[in-house]
C-alpha cells in the first residue's frame, strides 16, 4: 500500500502477515501503514517489506497516524527491515498528534540485522508486563465473542523477552466478509 492502507473502524488482529509498502514513482516515502479511528489494530509476528516502484530510494512509512486520539495500534514482534521511519508514528493533519494517541505501542520489533527497532517516541515502547496484558485480553478486546478456528491464545513473553506462539494460517475471507 501507499497511504493509510489499513484504515477505519473495526477491531483487527493481523498475525504472521506481510505488509508490503509501495513507494511512489517520484519519492521513496510510502506514507502510513495505518489510520485507526477509535478502534484497535494489533500486528504481531508480521514482516514489513517494500516494493520501491523503480525508485532508487527505499520505500519507508510510519507505523500509522491517529485518525482520532482514541486510535489504538500495536506492532509487536514485527520485522521492520528498515522500512519504518525513525519517529515511528506520525501526526494527523487535523491536529491529533502521535503523542495524543495513548493506544499506540510497539514491542520487540526488529530490523533486518536482528537488532531491536524502537521508534524515537519513547512513550510508545511497551514493557513485558504491558505486552502480557495485551495478550491476555486479545479475545475480549479484539475478537469479542468470535473465536477464529486457528486462534492460539497462549503467547506470553519468556524471561529472556522472546515471544513465541503458533501462527494463524489459512484464514480466508468469503464474499460476506466472514472469516473462515
Regions found by a protein language model. Name each.
Residues 1-166:
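Sequence-level preference for short, compositionally simple segments enriched
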Residues 159-180:
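Pro/Thr/Ser/Gly-rich low-complexity, intrinsically disordered linker/stalk tracts
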Amino acid at each position: 500500500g501507499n497511504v493509510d492502507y489499513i484504515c477505519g473502524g473495526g477491531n483487527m488482529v493481523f498475525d504472521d502477515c506481510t505488509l508490503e509498502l509501495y513507494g511512489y514513482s517520484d519519492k521513496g516515502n510510502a506514507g502510513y501503514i495505518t489510520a485507526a479511528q477509535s478502534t484497535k489494530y494489533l500486528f504481531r509476528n508480521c514482516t514489513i517489506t517494500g516494493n520501491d516502484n523503480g525508485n532508487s530510494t527505499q520505500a519507508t512509512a510510519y507505523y500509522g497516524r491517529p485518525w482520532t486520539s482514541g486510535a489504538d495500534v500495536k506492532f509487536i514482534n514485527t520485522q521492520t527491515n528498515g522500512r519504518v521511519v525513525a519517529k515511528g508514528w506520525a501526526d494527523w493533519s487535523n491536529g491529533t498528534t502521535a503523542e495524543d494517541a495513548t493506544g499506540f505501542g510497539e514491542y520487540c520489533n526488529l530490523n533486518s540485522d536482528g537488532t531491536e527497532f524502537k521508534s524515537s517516541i519513547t512513550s510508545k515502547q511497551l514493557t513485558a508486563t504491558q505486552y502480557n496484558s495485551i495478550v491476555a485480553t486479545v479475545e475480549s478486546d479484539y475478537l469479542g465473542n468470535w473465536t477464529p478456528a486457528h486462534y492460539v491464545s497462549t503467547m506470553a513473553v519468556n524471561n529472556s523477552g522472546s515471544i513465541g506462539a503458533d501462527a494463524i494460517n489459512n484464514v480466508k475471507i468469503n464474499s460476506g466478509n466472514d472469516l473462515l
